[in-house]
Amino acid sequence: MTTIKLHNSKTRKKEVFTPIDPDNVQMYVCGPTVYDRAHLGNARPVVVFDVLFRLLRHVYGDKKVTYARNFTDVDDKINTRAAESGRAIGEITSETIQWFLEDMGALGALQPTHMPRATEYIPQMIAMIEELIARDHAYEAEGHVLFAVDSWREGYGQLSGRSVDDMIAGARVEVAPYKKNPMDFVLWKPSDADQPGWESPWGRGRPGWHIECSAMSHDLLGESFDIHCGGNDLMFPHHENEIAQSCCANPEGEFARYWLHNEMLQVEGKKMSKSLGNFFTVRDLLDQGIPGEVVRFVFLQTHYRKPMDWTEKKAAEAEATLRKWRALTAGIEPAATAAAAVVDALSDDLNTAGAIAEMHKLAAAGDGAGLLAAGQLVGLLGDEMGEWAAAPSVDLSAHEARLFKARQAAMETKDFSEVDRLKAAYTEAGLEVRMSKTGVELVPGAGFDAAKLEALS
C-alpha cells in the first residue's frame, strides 16, 4: 500500500500517516461562516483538502474515507448581516450555503460525506459544555459559560507553540470582568430577544464558535479521528480551543491525531483586501469567464504550506496548459491507475506542485491516457469541468502573421506605432502576446473575446 506522509502541525514534523482504522479513515475540515460569498482565500483549503480526500480514497478505497466539513450558521456576523438587510437569518444562511456548494463545485471539489450545520447540533454542544463543567474545566459567570484555561495548562498552547503565560503577557484586548483568566474563552453566551437563542441550563443563549466544531466532529467522527484541517489563521485560537474542549470533555480520546494547515493567499503579490481593490469572490472570477478548472489548476501549482499568489498571468498560463492537455486527452480512456510518480508526489505531504510537474512530463511524452488518469486523481480534466474548453477555438494565425510583419517593418523604419496599436488591441481582446525572434504567438486568456478582433479586420 502507498505510504502517505503528512506534515503534522502539532509535532511540526512530517510523519507517516497511519489511520486509526484503515477501513474508516476520517477527516474533518473547518468550513465557512455562511453570511456572504466565498472569497478566493476561502476556496484554497476547500481545493487543497479535496485533493487529500481524493488521495485517501485512492489509497484506502472510495467507501472507506469519511470526510466532514461544517457550516457555521450561528454567528454574530450573520446576525449583523440579517439586521442590516432586514432578511431572516435562515434565509441568508440557506442561500449562502447553496452559493458555497455551487462555487466549490465549479472548482471541482467533491462534496464531503457529512456537511453539518451548527444549528443542527445545539443539543450536542450543550451536552459537551455540561461535561466540561462536571469535570471542572468550565464555569458559569453572568449568563456565560467559559472554558477554564488554567484547568488544562499542561495541554493548552501545544498546537500553536505558545504558553499560557506568554499569551496573557501578549494580550492586547480588554478582558471581560467575569473571566477568571484573561485567556478563558466562551462556550455559551446569553442571547437578547432579537438574537438567535436556544434554551439551556444557563438560560436562553447560543454557542461560542469553538464548541461548535468540537461537538460536530465528536458526534460524526467520535472522540478520536485521523485528520483535522484548516487554514493556518485558524490554528490559534480556534483549533487550540477545539483541542482543549475535546480533550477535556473526552480525556480517553485523542481528538485529531494529524493537523494540517494551509498557508494564506495573495493577489498579485499583495494581501487580498477590499481597500486595495484586489478582493475577489470565487463567483467574481467565474462571472469574469475564468473557468473553475483554471482556478483549481492555479491553486494546485503551489504547495499548500506555502503562500499562494493569484495572478492574471498564472490564470492565462493555466488556461493555455489545460487547453493543450484536454486536446491530448480528448476521446480516450484514462490509464487503469495514475502514474506512480504522481501518486508519490501527492503522498509526500500533498505535493500538488510536484504532481503537476509530473503531469507536464506525461503530456510532453504524449501519454494522454496517463495524463487523464493523473488529472482525475487531482480533480482536473474531468468531463464535468470541460465545457469551457469545448468552445470553438479561433484561428489566430492571420493575426499572428500580421503582428509579425508589422514588427519586421518597424525594425526597418523604427516606427513601432502600428506594433503598439496591434498589441494593445490584442491585449484588450484578452490575448496574451508572446513575441520572439522567430515569430509571434497569441494565447487566449480567461477573458478572451473573439468579437473584439473584428475591429482589426
UniProtKB/Swiss-Prot annotation:
Its EC number is 6.1.1.16. SMART domains: DALR_2 (SM00840). One of its GO terms (biological process) is cysteinyl-tRNA aminoacylation. It is found in: Cytoplasm. It catalyses: tRNA(Cys) + L-cysteine + ATP = L-cysteinyl-tRNA(Cys) + AMP + diphosphate. Signal peptide: none annotated. Its main location: cytoplasm. A motif ('HIGH' region) lies at residues 32-42. Its cofactor is Zn(2+). Pfam families: CysS_C, tRNA-synt_1e. GO terms for cellular component: cytosol. Disulfide bonds: none annotated. Belongs to the class-I aminoacyl-tRNA synthetase family. PANTHER family: CYSTEINE--TRNA LIGASE, CYTOPLASMIC (PTHR10890:SF3), CYSTEINYL-TRNA SYNTHETASE (PTHR10890). HAMAP family: Cys_tRNA_synth. Monomer. This is Cysteine--tRNA ligase. It comes from Ruegeria sp. (strain TM1040). The gene is cysS.
